[in-house]
């Protein structure tokens, strides 16, 4: 990762948003590992490594991409399209429910951090009014952009949580 100057506030927002203790539910979400174990797909270190590689690939092109695209969103219309796109890529009902719940919680935190950013406020309000489905990567991307964090750092930090 490149060394880039950043404000102390931006660094604090990164640390806060990506803290595993942040009460969004991400810490307790197994990302499908429990199901893979129960189905006999993960039984040893080798099969776990295979599962983990698949998870990281999905996270890179799913959640990290959601962070970057949310970081770039400039309008409510594009935000709505991104939310719908992210929801449509989640095929398992458990994943949709988990993402919706975590997205709602992350958006609430984002609004506390950046109460004057129009897209942060819009996403939180839209989730409460059920106009959006919810995705924590979108909420994180919006708040990290608003805090002045570049998109590369935002995506990398999000994957570290």
Residue map of PLM features:
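Extended, highly charged
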Residues: 152
């Amino acid at each position: 990762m490149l060394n880039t100057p950043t404000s102390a506030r931006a660094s604090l927002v990164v640390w806060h948003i990506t803290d595993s203790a942040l009460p969004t539910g991400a810490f307790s979400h197994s990302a499908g590992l429990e199901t893979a174990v129960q189905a006999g797909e993960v039984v040893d270190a080798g099969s776990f490594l295979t599962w983990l590689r698949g998870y990281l690939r999905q996270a890179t092109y799913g959640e990290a991409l959601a962070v970057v695209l949310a970081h770039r969103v400039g309008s409510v219309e594009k935000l709505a399209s991104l939310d719908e796109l992210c929801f449509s890529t989640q095929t398992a009902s458990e994943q949709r429910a988990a993402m919706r719940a975590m997205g709602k919680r992350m958006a609430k935190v984002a609004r506390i951090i950046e109460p004057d950013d129009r897209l942060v406020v819009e996403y939180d309000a839209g989730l409460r009014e059920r106009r959006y489905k919810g995705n924590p990567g979108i909420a994180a991307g919006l708040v990290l952009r608003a805090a002045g964090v570049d998109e590369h750092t935002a995506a990398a930090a999000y994957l570290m949580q």
